[in-house]
Amino acid sequence: MDKQHQNKTPKLHIGSLIKRELEKQERTVSWFARKLCCDRSNVYKLFKRSTIDTELLLRVSQILHYDFFDFYKKELCE
């Protein structure tokens, strides 16, 4: 990987995008935590994260029926 690629900071904040979609769907943090099998506090921590593990992102995408990977696909095209 070249230096230009290594120093590139992510433009998107995945936690904020997940939070926005959850609110758009009018779902509660409690509902989302139950679906993820975790505590509400972990959901709030997720909202603050700028990066995410792909397996977790897949689970989130399935739960919310929303392709969050699409944001990363768009980043690749820029």
PLM regions and their residue ranges:
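Short C-terminal boundary/hinge segments that cap the last helix of small helical domains
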Residues: 65-78
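Short alpha-helical "recognition helix" segments of helix-turn-helix
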Residues: 31-33
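Residues within the alpha-helical elements of helix-turn-helix
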Residues: 24, 35, 63
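Short, basic-rich loop-to-helix N-cap that marks the start of a DNA-contacting helix
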Residues: 49-62
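Recognition helix of helix-turn-helix/homeodomain-like DNA-binding domains
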Residues: 37-52
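A short, Lys/Arg-rich alpha-helix, primarily the initiator
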Residues: 1-27
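Key DNA-contacting residues within the recognition helix of helix-turn-helix
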Residues: 19, 44-45, 72
